[in-house]
């Protein structure tokens, strides 16, 4: 931990935390360089006793310290589940107009606020957890649940919310429900933080600032949130062409058909390069009696990128043709007339398409829906 980024109370407390506790509770203290990004749209706020601020996961009070410094007359509410951090925060701001509540924010009943600011916990819900389908589909995450509750229950009309959260909010298919809500609001800022001073996390993060008023379309593209404006292209998308889109097969469904013989090729992401199929010594094959296979010609699209935080998305695709072949479920299969496949291949080869993909793909994965949304540049 860079001590210059935190108050002494936080650096001392951080030393007492185990990696297990930090991971389980999603504890990542917010460094000063990142905290400052949360206050870029607060210049018009009046520093008056009637001005109210909420920090829904206040921890040891790093973000509250910024609030106290910038708005000393405001009424500040902090909510913290962890008893130790709640106690530290209460003592730290005992002489200020700060009220710390030791509760689970997702169960907390509170009022509405002019400004909500924070860095909510990043914790994926366990398998089997029943999601609120207004927030997420598939496996939810605490950070989107915090975000939804803040917007729908605690943000005043024309109030502003500023959060540091994983960049998956921009295009993850899991979080499409809450993203549809966000897009209806005025997104003042959305910035991908490829470089940041957080400790103990390689999660790609973003800062998002939302005003509780009707949206303007800024920082949005169809059903996605992005950090650059992208022109809309009418109905001219890959998904509008006369093509069939499918995903490959999960390993569990083909495992019994694997063989050492060179029979039916089974491609994985590692085989798909830029306009090239790579067949190496570790190539997988299926027996002729497999029921899981494709036939004929197709364009194979690698959906998972090896790119890390701060790097560009590594896009891969290639045409392939054979009597029988199969792919894993990290590959999208596009089939159709040769002339139409050639159109898609030409689009994917263009630099402008690569730039487009790198704007929208901020979590290292292209979904089929996002692939279909690529314009015919």
Swiss-Prot record:
PROSITE patterns found in the cross-reference section: N6_MTASE
GO molecular function terms attached to this record: DNA binding; site-specific DNA-methyltransferase (adenine-specific) activity
CDD domains linked: AdoMet_MTases
InterPro entries documented for this protein: DNA_methylase_N6_adenine_CS, MethylTrfase_TaqI-like_dom, N4_N6_ade-DNA_methylase, SAM-dependent_MTases_sf
Protein name: Modification methylase CviBIII
Signal peptide boundaries: none
Entry keywords, A to Z: DNA-binding, Methyltransferase, S-adenosyl-L-methionine, Transferase
Short name of one Pfam family: Eco57I
EC numbers: 2.1.1.72
Biological processes annotated in GO: DNA modification; methylation
Catalysed transformations (reactions): a 2'-deoxyadenosine in DNA + S-adenosyl-L-methionine = an N(6)-methyl-2'-deoxyadenosine in DNA + S-adenosyl-L-homocysteine + H(+)
Observed effect of gene inactivation: Not essential for viral replication it can be deleted.
Keyword DNA-binding included in the entry's annotation: yes
């Amino acid at each position: 931990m860079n001590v210059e980024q935190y108050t002494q109370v936080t650096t001392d407390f951080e030393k007492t935390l185990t990696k297990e506790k930090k991971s389980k509770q999603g504890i990542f203290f917010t460094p000063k360089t990142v905290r400052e990004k949360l206050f870029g749209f607060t210049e018009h706020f009046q520093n008056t006793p009637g001005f109210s601020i909420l920090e829904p996961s206040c921890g040891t009070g790093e973000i509250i310290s910024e609030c106290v410094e910038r708005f000393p007359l405001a009424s500040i509410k902090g909510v913290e589940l962890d008893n130790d951090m709640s106690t530290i925060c209460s003592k730290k701001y005992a002489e200020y107009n700060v009220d710390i509540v030791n509760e689970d924010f997702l169960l907390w009943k509170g009022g509405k606020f002019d400004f909500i600011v924070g860095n909510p916990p990043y914790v994926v819900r366990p398998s089997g957890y029943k999601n609120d389908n207004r927030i997420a589909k598939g496996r939810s995450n605490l950070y989107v649940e915090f975000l939804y509750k803040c917007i729908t229950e605690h943000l005043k009309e024309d109030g502003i919310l500023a959060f540091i959260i994983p960049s998956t909010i921009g295009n993850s298919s899991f979080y499409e429900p809450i993203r549809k809500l966000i897009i209806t609001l005025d997104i003042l800022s959305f910035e991908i933080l490829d470089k940041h001073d957080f400790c103990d996390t390689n999660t790609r993060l973003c800062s998002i600032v939302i005003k509780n008023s009707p949206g303007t379309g800024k920082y949005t593209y169809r059903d996605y949130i992005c950090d650059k404006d992208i022109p809309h292209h009418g109905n001219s998308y890959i998904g509008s062409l006369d093509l069939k889109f499918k995903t490959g097969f999960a390993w569990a469904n083909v495992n019994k058909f694997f063989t050492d013989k060179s029979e039916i090729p089974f491609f994985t992401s590692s085989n798909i390069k830029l306009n090239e199929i790579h067949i190496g010594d570790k190539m997988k094959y299926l027996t002729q009696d497999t029921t899981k296979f494709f036939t004929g010609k197709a364009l194979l699209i690698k959906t998972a990128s090896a790119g890390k935080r701060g790097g560009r998305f590594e896009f891969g695709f290639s045409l392939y043709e054979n009597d029988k072949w199969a792919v894993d479920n990290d590959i999208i299969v596009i089939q159709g007339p040769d002339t139409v496949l050639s159109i898609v291949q030409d689009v994917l080869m263009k630099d402008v398409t690569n730039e487009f993909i790198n704007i929208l793909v901020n979590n290292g994965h292209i979904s089929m829906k996002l692939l279909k949304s690529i314009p015919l540049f």
